[in-house]
């Protein structure tokens, strides 16, 4: 382990010089590409600096030196044995304080650099670069979409939401730092029958003044109460309220928009504390009018099949269960909305990569969605990446907002 750590540290130090050259705001004549330095010093008749540069490697053992040049490939050109070539080059290598030692060993020329000089150059480079240290322009002209946090409307942040939020925000900042145009997307969970339940609960037990005062936690209390006390009649009312939302009913949508406004006011306060930002809050509802064309395309391309009344894409040939596109009642599902979202994002942002920072339990879901897009002829499906992570659970099992079994994030931060 110690040996591997030494190698990693050595590799990082030795490559600092070359790496820092691609930093947009940092230039220093002191920063050196040691491989280039060695190859230019050794270039001779019959051996170009380019050939030497491409041959230089890191020795397997740090005790052998920091760089090694195998001389075997030069034997034919120079008409000498590798050992003689290495010895001759070692004797002629200039001692100027950059390279501490050049030693010929069994046909190899091993170099040990001056660590004191390297340390000074590295520190000078870090100080000169300041906050830009480690940045680059490698992503210039490329866009990376990152779907993370993706909160549910009317549900407070619990500790489990921190993983996707922190990982996604870190990736967002890293990609920006590397010169990419990062697009942070908060794919709001603002679609589903639960909002019919919430409106029903509010109609039965809610008070506007109390909800305004209690904010998102007051809304969540209503949702929890519905799930523990709702009668069959209330369940039917909830389904009807959701239908009203979908059909554009003014009162139902005004209530929903109010819940959404309270939610965003709350979550943006959390994001501010965490120093997390987003460029888009386009949630599931945003894609309502964009799912129809996706379903039509699937049907036109012969990918859509009926199974027990539902519309599916058969993925059995690819080792996966079918991807459900429409339920038997014609309602859309997560996959339908994610297909529409991916197509919209490609059209809008022309991304180089699109990352989904979502728990590992959704591995199958994303494999299915990516495969369906591939079958639809979207060659960019290969640029979709599921960044999976483990779920956070309590001692007595998984958290559940519906059951009120959670640890709120604001109580932790």
Enumerate the predicted regions with their spans.
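Compositionally biased amphipathic helical and low-complexity segments enriched in hydrophobic
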Residues: 7-15, 43, 179
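Active-site-proximal helix-loop elements at catalytic-domain edges
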Residues: 24-38
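Short, positively charged and aromatic/hydrophobic N-terminal segments
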Residues: 10, 15-28
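Charged/polar low-complexity intrinsically disordered segments
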Residues: 3-6, 21
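NTP-dependent nucleotidyl-transfer catalytic core
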Residues: 36-37, 43-77, 81-413
């Amino acid at each position: 382990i110690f040996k591997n750590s030494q190698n990693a540290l050595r590799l990082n130090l030795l490559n600092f010089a070359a790496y820092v050259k691609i930093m947009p705001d940092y230039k220093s004549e002191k920063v050196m590409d040691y491989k280039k330095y060695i190859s230019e010093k050794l270039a001779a008749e019959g051996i170009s600096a380019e050939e030497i540069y491409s041959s230089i490697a890191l020795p397997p053992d740090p005790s052998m030196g920091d760089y090694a040049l195998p001389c075997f490939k030069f034997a034919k050109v120079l008409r000498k044995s590798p050992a003689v070539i290495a010895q001759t080059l070692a004797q002629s290598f200039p001692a100027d304080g950059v390279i501490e030692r050049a030693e010929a060993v069994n046909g190899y020329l091993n170099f040990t650099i001056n660590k004191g000089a390297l340390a000074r150059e590295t520190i000078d480079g870090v100080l000169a670069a300041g906050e830009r240290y480690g940045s680059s322009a490698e992503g210039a002209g490329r866009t990376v979409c990152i779907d993370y946090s993706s909160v549910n409307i009317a549900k407070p942040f619990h500790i489990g939401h921190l993983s996707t939020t922190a990982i996604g925000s870190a990736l967002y900042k890293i990609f920006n730092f590397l010169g990419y145009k990062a697009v942070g997307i908060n794919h709001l969970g603002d679609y589903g029958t639960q909002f019919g339940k919430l409106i029903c609960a509010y109609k039965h037990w809610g008070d506007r003044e109390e909800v305004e005062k209690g904010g998102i936690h007051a809304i969540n209390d209503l949702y929890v109460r519905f799930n523990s006390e709702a009668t069959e009649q209330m369940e039917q009312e909830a389904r009807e309220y959701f239908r009203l939302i979908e059909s554009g009913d003014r009162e139902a949508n005004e209530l929903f928009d109010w819940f959404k406004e309270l939610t965003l006011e709350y979550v943006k306060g959390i994001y501010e504390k965490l120093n997390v930002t987003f460029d888009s809050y386009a949630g599931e509802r945003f894609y309502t009018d964009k799912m129809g064309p996706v379903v039509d395309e699937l049907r036109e391309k012969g990918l859509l099949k009926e199974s027990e009344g539902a519309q599916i894409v058969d993925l059995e040939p690819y080792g996966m269960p079918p991807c459900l596109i429409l339920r038997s009642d014609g309602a859309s599902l997560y996959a339908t909305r994610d297909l529409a979202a991916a197509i919209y994002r490609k059209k809008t942002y022309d991304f180089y990569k699109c990352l989904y920072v979502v728990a590992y339990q959704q591995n199958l879901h994303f494999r299915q969605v990516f495969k369906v897009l591939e079958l639809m002829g979207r060659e960019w499906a290969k640029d979709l990446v599921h960044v999976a992570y483990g779920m956070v659970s309590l001692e007595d099992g998984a958290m559940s907002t519906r059951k009120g079994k959670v640890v709120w994030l604001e109580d932790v931060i």
